[in-house]
Amino acid sequence: MLKKILVFCSILFAFQSMVLAQNEIVKPLTIGQTVTLKSKILKEERTLNIYLPLGFDKAKSYPVIYLLDGSMNEDFIHVSGLVQFFNQMYAMPQTILVGIANVDRKRDFTYHTDVKDLQKDYPTTGHSDQFISFLEKELKPYVESHYKTTDTYIFGQSLGGLLATEILLKKPEMFNNYFIISPSLWWDDQSLIKQAKQLLSKSPDTKKFVYVSVGKGEHPVMVKDAESIYDILKNSNKKNWTVEYKMMEGDNHATILHRSLYEGLVKMFPYKEPK
C-alpha cells in the first residue's frame, strides 16, 4: 500500500511540474547593451557596457557617466542600480552609464614613472596619455554620435581615481563632474600632487563639480594624499568649481566605492520630499 502511495505521489508531482513548465515564460533580463569598439589609438578592441535609462528616447538629451573599471564583473552592474535609484528617489535626471571594461588598468590608468621599484613591480604601466587620448578622441565622440548628451561625469577609484585626478588637472574640459574615490596619488612619489597647484593655475574656471573621498580604514598614505588633493582643489580660487570631500568612516579600500558614490551623488542631488 505504501509503495502505491509513493508511486502515485511521484506521478502527481511529475504532472504538476509539467503543467508549471508549460505555463511559465522565461525571458532574458537585460539592463543594458555591450558594444565592442575598435580603437586605433590603443590598437585593440575595447568593450563598453552601456546602461540606458527606462523609456530611453533617442530624441532626448541625457547626462553621461563614464565609469572606469566598468566590466560586468567589476562595477558596472551595481553602479547601474545606483544611477537608477537616484533617478527614482532623488533629483538626478535620467542618465546614461558607459562602463569601460578593463584590458590592463595598470597600463591605462598610470602615467610614466622613473621610480625603479614601480617599473619593476608594474612593468606595463605608464600609458595613461594614450588612454586619455582614447577617451577624448574615440570614446566620447562615439557616445556623442550615438546619443544626445548633456553633462558628463567620470567615476574612478584607486588607480581609476588617479586617472580621474590626472584628467582633472591636465584636461579639465573633458568632463563636467569628477568623482575621485580613494585615488592612488602615491604613484610616482606623489608627483601629481606636487604638480597640482601649477596645473590648476592654467585651468579655466568653468563650472565643475569635484568629489573626493577616502575610507578611514585605508592606508594612512591614501588618506593623507586624498586630503592633500582636496585641500589644493578647495583653495585653488575656482569660483565656479564645487569641491566636496567625504571621509567614509566605516570603509576601507575594498569596501568604499558603492557607499562613497552614494554619498557623492547625495551632495549633487539632495533628497527633497515630494510635494
Region roles according to the model:
Residues 161-172:
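Short glycine-enriched nucleophile-adjacent loop
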